[in-house]
Amino acid sequence: MSKIVDIKAREILDSRGNPTIEADVILESGASGSACAPSGASTGSREALELRDGDKSRYLGKGVTKAVGNVNSAIRELLVGMEVSDQKALDQAMLDADGTENKGNLGANAILAVSLAAAKAAAVDQGKPLYEYISDLQDDDNEYSLPVPMMNIINGGEHADNNVDIQEFMIQPVGAPTVAEAIRYGAEIFHALKGVLKKRGLNTAVGDEGGFAPNLPSNEAALEAIMEAIEIAGYKAGDDVTLALDCAASEFYKDGKYVLAGEDRSMNSEEFADYLAELCDRYPIISIEDGMDESDWDGWKILTEKLGKKVQLVGDDLFVTNTRILQRGIDEKVANSILIKFNQIGSLTETLDAIKMAKDAGYTAVISHRSGETADTTIADLAVATAAGQIKTGSLCRSDRVAKYNRLIRIEQELGRAAYHGRKEFKLLG
């Protein structure tokens, strides 16, 4: 047991060269923890507010000195003297002080950085790894589980400067025996894909999340390139490795139509659901994220009725890690999975609440990074602690992405036992 004696924050840079906030929580025992807030590019309209300065003379208006100031003044005054191990009380105190539904006063980035830094400090104080400390915060007895990585090896949409409409084309090494081997599968396929693209005379520059970002004639062309890379790397698509998509459909939903500009196609909700179903028939796709616009609930119902019994349908912009919105989805039988992003909701306690609600309803939970990341690896510990079973943390290059994979490898070695369950994490696969 140890009380907080100091909190400090600073403005640092994320993986896109934009400012973000880093916070330190220092305890009377001498233990401390530091954490950073990530930032998204394609964001849901109902996400908690990321407080930016808006001063165009600094960082093009994206500075976070207001959020830093809130940590160094209001939040510091609020939390100094409180017991660090009472995570719920710390988070609730910040939520009450903010007083808004979207954390618009103090800023979700300020609250989150402190919330995670406090958890890290408490873990150090108690001599526990972070995943063990987070696990202890939950009401149920989860067994640790190493998540199946969902590796984004072709980037499109808002994550790349190319003509590909679907935002993420991912591979999942479901046939690997360990997380270290899953990461090896992914790395080998990533390098094979580079060769495939080079052979076709395509660009092998990478996007925000480390995946390749070539101009391609269609979404199918991206899938075909990945299928070829899987084979060249010596793996079998559908058995060793499956595919996943993040459509980020809100980014190309215009006037009630899904407009694939790269393919010069425009579809209504039912037609787009049919399009996705056809892709699933042709390729071993077992997960689709944001297959409809966040406001197109009727479209989501169509998609869920069409694919929900055989494909994981993940709500990201749809649910924004918010239990109130997730409950509506559960009640209306929309989607069957939720993407979990710390900064969409803004505190560790609320994040754990969303994971629990999803699990209790039979929904899966996919722990996720953001496109604007740092070296912070907390999401790896969160995935293990909650036995979520799946993690999205980008491709197999860029140190901001690889840091999370390396953390998973270290955790697996620490646990010293098999905790990677591969395809068993996908109940729809049987």
UniProtKB/Swiss-Prot annotation:
Binding positions for Mg(2+) per the UniProt entry: 246, 289, 316
Assigned keywords, A-Z: Cytoplasm, Glycolysis, Lyase, Magnesium, Metal-binding, Secreted
Known pathway: Carbohydrate degradation; glycolysis; pyruvate from D-glyceraldehyde 3-phosphate: step 4/5
Gene Ontology terms describing biological process: glycolytic process
Keyword presence, Lyase: yes
Pfam families: Enolase_C, Enolase_N
Enzyme class label: lyase
Cell compartments where the protein resides: Cytoplasm; Secreted; Cell surface
Cofactor note: Binds a second Mg(2+) ion via substrate during catalysis.
Keyword Nucleotide-binding found: no
Any one Gene Ontology cellular component term annotated for this protein: cell surface
Molecular functions per Gene Ontology: magnesium ion binding; phosphopyruvate hydratase activity
Residues the record marks as active site: 209 (proton donor), 341 (proton acceptor)
Names of required cofactors: Mg(2+)
Catalytic activity of the protein: (2R)-2-phosphoglycerate = phosphoenolpyruvate + H2O
Cross-referenced InterPro entries: Enolase, Enolase-like_C_sf, Enolase-like_N, Enolase_C, Enolase_CS, Enolase_N
Superkingdom field: Bacteria
The EC number(s) this enzyme carries: 4.2.1.11
Positions with a binding annotation for (2R)-2-phosphoglycerate: 167, 341, 370-371, 392
HAMAP family: Enolase
Function (record text): Catalyzes the reversible conversion of 2-phosphoglycerate (2-PG) into phosphoenolpyruvate (PEP). It is essential for the degradation of carbohydrates via glycolysis.
Quaternary structure and interacting proteins, as annotated: Component of the RNA degradosome, a multiprotein complex involved in RNA processing and mRNA degradation.
Family: Belongs to the enolase family.
Name of this chain's protein: Enolase
Gene transcribed to yield this protein: eno
